[in-house]
């Protein structure tokens, strides 16, 4: 048996192992298409600023071709470094495209004020054809997307500080698009706006230079459909991270935006580890989880073997991403989602409408959190040097704060999970209903006895008083038994509950309501 378990462990390890580079053949190259990337041919700020202005207008052209749009975006993304050409040549290794760098310089003979640098021949006509477009015939107005503020016609500046701020503003909006462009492009607008507000408040960007929605939609769609552009952006992020010492301000901003980009599309895997394993609840000892725990272990080892590209596997369309799908560990994922919903309010809006979602294990995760609330892990307590008295004190405080939190919490979290029931709970619900009926009968007897004793004690009253009113206790006129304000508050709440219960018992429709039935499929969507 020991050898079988050892062989099983080796099998799981080799099964999820990525293929090694071997054989006599080299890298497989596809049919490449040429991407023209204009770069500044001198160190003048005017040249860079004028080039940025032309590129922004090119991207906003609705009729721009895909390869030309990719080249313009690569040029914009690399304008913040001192030598954009060297950067592009160093980090670009794409089997699908061939990048052709073209230097641009200032010129007074072209419409754009720029021309392609050459040693002899004039390239003014070629520069005009590249940077400008023909106006449509018939007097039709071309719709171009630039900035939300239509008063901004150009962004050409002369000083380096102003250029860096404008460039940082444009780059921030482009990099923010990468976070959701691949996974959820249709619902990305809200999160992108929150990121923009954050950097505006931090004075990293200029709020007046907010790009138009149509411009952003064009770039988002291009990022989603062009793998080569995403490869360049990921390579640029990794190159910035490897740079030692202090980095330029724009580079630091890109690294900050990268925190929203990494692990995009890997939420199921990351959340399963966070809520299912790191919480270390005893439910992990179930036999049902044994196989999936070994699967998660193999995936974690595979994630580490992939190195620095692992967090970007979905963005880079790596085929190995399918191994990390929640369908490979459905029971553990369902359990982890139940734990997460109870621990974090932000998990309440998560969509659980998956074919492999298991409500029973989801509820198992919920119950583990609820029943383990306030308990201290003995292993962790021993590592931290926590005594038994301190652990008991922590448990009491945690239980009190948990009750206070539950009393204030309302809404989505409980409404999403209260319907999750299994067929095994039928007997429990039946026993609970019997207990409820017995409790109702007992309360009715006590209420009847109380109302009967009140009749002997009350004075003659000409007004007709209903029996339900006689059983109600006036909290305001009840004499105080002690001077403890907390005790008085609890007593008042208890009396109010008794009043509400008495009113319910007098309701003739009591007991006629049929239990409400929920449709799991409808509520999960």
Swiss-Prot record:
<dbReference type="Pfam" id="PF00973">
    <property type="entry name" value="Paramyxo_ncap"/>
</dbReference>
<feature type="binding site">
    <location>
        <position position="202"/>
    </location>
    <ligand>
        <name>RNA</name>
    </ligand>
</feature>
<comment type="subunit">
    <text>Homomultimer; forms the nucleocapsid. Binds to viral genomic RNA. N0 interacts (via Ncore) with the phosphoprotein (via N-terminus); this interaction allows P to chaperon N0 to avoid N polymerization before encapsidation. Interacts as N-RNA template with the phosphoprotein (via C-terminus); this interaction positions the polymerase on the template. Interacts with the phosphoprotein; this interaction leads to the formation of membraneless organelles that function as viral replication factories.</text>
</comment>
<keyword id="KW-0687">Ribonucleoprotein</keyword>
<feature type="region of interest" description="Homomultimerization">
    <location>
        <begin position="373"/>
        <end position="391"/>
    </location>
</feature>
<feature type="region of interest" description="Disordered">
    <location>
        <begin position="449"/>
        <end position="489"/>
    </location>
</feature>
<dbReference type="GO" id="GO:0019029">
    <property type="term" value="C:helical viral capsid"/>
</dbReference>
<feature type="region of interest" description="Ntail">
    <location>
        <begin position="404"/>
        <end position="525"/>
    </location>
</feature>
<feature type="binding site">
    <location>
        <position position="180"/>
    </location>
    <ligand>
        <name>RNA</name>
    </ligand>
</feature>
<keyword id="KW-0946">Virion</keyword>
<feature type="region of interest" description="Homomultimerization">
    <location>
        <begin position="1"/>
        <end position="36"/>
    </location>
</feature>
<dbReference type="GO" id="GO:0030430">
    <property type="term" value="C:host cell cytoplasm"/>
</dbReference>
<keyword id="KW-0167">Capsid protein</keyword>
<dbReference type="GO" id="GO:0005198">
    <property type="term" value="F:structural molecule activity"/>
</dbReference>
<dbReference type="GO" id="GO:0003723">
    <property type="term" value="F:RNA binding"/>
</dbReference>
<keyword id="KW-1139">Helical capsid protein</keyword>
<comment type="function">
    <text>Forms the helical nucleocapsid (NC) in a ratio of 1 N per 6 ribonucleotides, protecting the genome from nucleases. The nucleocapsid (NC) has a helical structure with either 12.35 or 11.64 N per turn, approximately 20 nm in diameter, with a hollow central cavity approximately 5 nm in diameter. The encapsidated genomic RNA serves as template for transcription and replication; encapsidation by N is coupled to RNA synthesis. Forms the encapsidation complex with the phosphoprotein protein P. Before encapsidation, the newly synthesized free N protein, so-called N0, is chaperoned by P.</text>
</comment>
<feature type="compositionally biased region" description="Basic and acidic residues">
    <location>
        <begin position="449"/>
        <end position="459"/>
    </location>
</feature>
<keyword id="KW-0694">RNA-binding</keyword>
<dbReference type="GO" id="GO:0019013">
    <property type="term" value="C:viral nucleocapsid"/>
</dbReference>
<protein>
    <recommendedName>
        <fullName>Nucleoprotein</fullName>
    </recommendedName>
</protein>
<dbReference type="InterPro" id="IPR002021">
    <property type="entry name" value="Paramyx_ncap"/>
</dbReference>
<keyword id="KW-1035">Host cytoplasm</keyword>
<feature type="region of interest" description="Disordered">
    <location>
        <begin position="504"/>
        <end position="525"/>
    </location>
</feature>
<feature type="region of interest" description="Ncore">
    <location>
        <begin position="1"/>
        <end position="403"/>
    </location>
</feature>
<feature type="binding site">
    <location>
        <position position="260"/>
    </location>
    <ligand>
        <name>RNA</name>
    </ligand>
</feature>
<dbReference type="GO" id="GO:1990904">
    <property type="term" value="C:ribonucleoprotein complex"/>
</dbReference>
<feature type="region of interest" description="Interaction with the phosphoprotein">
    <location>
        <begin position="477"/>
        <end position="505"/>
    </location>
</feature>
<keyword id="KW-0543">Viral nucleoprotein</keyword>
<feature type="region of interest" description="RNA packaging and organization of the helical nucleocapsid">
    <location>
        <begin position="1"/>
        <end position="375"/>
    </location>
</feature>
<feature type="binding site">
    <location>
        <position position="351"/>
    </location>
    <ligand>
        <name>RNA</name>
    </ligand>
</feature>
<feature type="binding site">
    <location>
        <position position="195"/>
    </location>
    <ligand>
        <name>RNA</name>
    </ligand>
</feature>
<comment type="similarity">
    <text>Belongs to the paramyxoviruses nucleocapsid family.</text>
</comment>
């Amino acid at each position: 048996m020991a050898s079988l378990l050892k062989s099983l462990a080796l099998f799981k390890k080799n099964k999820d192992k990525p293929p090694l580079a071997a054989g006599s053949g080299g890298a497989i190259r596809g049919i490449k298409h040429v991407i023209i990337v204009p770069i500044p041919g001198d160190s003048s700020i005017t040249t860079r600023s004028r080039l940025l202005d032309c590129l922004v207008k090119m991207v906003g052209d609705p009729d721009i071709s895909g390869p030309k749009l990719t080249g313009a975006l690569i040029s914009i993304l690399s304008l913040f470094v001192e030598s954009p050409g060297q950067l592009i040549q160093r980090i670009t290794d794409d089997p699908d495209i061939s990048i052709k760098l073209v230097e641009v310089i200032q010129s007074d003979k072209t419409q754009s004020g720029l021309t392609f640098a050459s040693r002899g021949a004039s390239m003014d006509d070629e520069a005009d054809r590249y940077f400008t477009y023909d106006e449509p015939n018939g007097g039709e107005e071309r719709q171009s997307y630039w900035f939300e503020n239509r008063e901004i016609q150009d962004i050409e500046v002369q000083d380096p500080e102003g250029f860096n701020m404008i460039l940082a503003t444009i780059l921030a909006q482009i990099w923010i698009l990468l976070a959701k462009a691949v996974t959820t492009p249709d619902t990305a607008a809200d999160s992108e706006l929150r990121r923009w507000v954050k950097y505006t408040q931090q004075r990293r960007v200029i709020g007046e230079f907010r790009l138009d929605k149509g411009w952003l939609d064009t770039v988002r769609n291009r990022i989603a459909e062009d793998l080569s552009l995403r490869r360049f952006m990921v390579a640029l992020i990794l190159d910035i991270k490897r740079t030692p010492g202090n980095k330029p301000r724009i580079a630091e901003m890109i690294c900050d935006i990268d925190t929203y980009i990494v692990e995009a599309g890997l939420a199921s895997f990351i959340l399963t580890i966070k809520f299912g394993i790191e919480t270390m609840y005893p439910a992990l000892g179930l036999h049902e989880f044994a196989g999936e725990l070994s699967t998660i272990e193999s995936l974690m080892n595979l994630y580490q073997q992939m190195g620095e590209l692992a967090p970007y596997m979905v963005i880079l369309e790596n085929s190995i991403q399918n191994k990390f799908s929640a369908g490979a560990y459905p029971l553990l994922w369902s359990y982890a989602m139940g734990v997460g919903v109870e621990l974090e309010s932000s998990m309440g809006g998560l969509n659980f409408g998956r074919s492999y979602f298991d409500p029973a294990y989801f509820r198992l995760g919920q119950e583990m959190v609820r029943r383990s609330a306030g308990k201290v892990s003995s292993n962790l307590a021993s590592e931290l040097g926590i005594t038994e008295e301190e652990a008991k004190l922590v448990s009491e405080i945690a239980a009190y704060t948990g009750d206070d939190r539950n009393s204030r919490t309302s809404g989505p979290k409980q409404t999403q999970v209260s319907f999750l029931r299994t067929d095994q709970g039928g007997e429990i619900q039946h026993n609970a209903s019997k207990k409820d009926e017995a409790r109702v009968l007992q309360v009715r007897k006590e209420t009847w006895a109380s109302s009967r004793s009140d009749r002997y004690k009350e004075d003659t009253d000409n007004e007709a008083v209903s029996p339900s009113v006689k059983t109600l206790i006036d909290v305001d006129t009840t004499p105080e038994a002690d001077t403890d304000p907390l005790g008085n508050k609890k007593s008042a709440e208890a009396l109010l509950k008794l009043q509400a219960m008495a009113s319910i018992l007098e309701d003739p429709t009591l007991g006629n309501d049929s239990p409400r039935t929920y449709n799991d499929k409808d509520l999960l969507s």
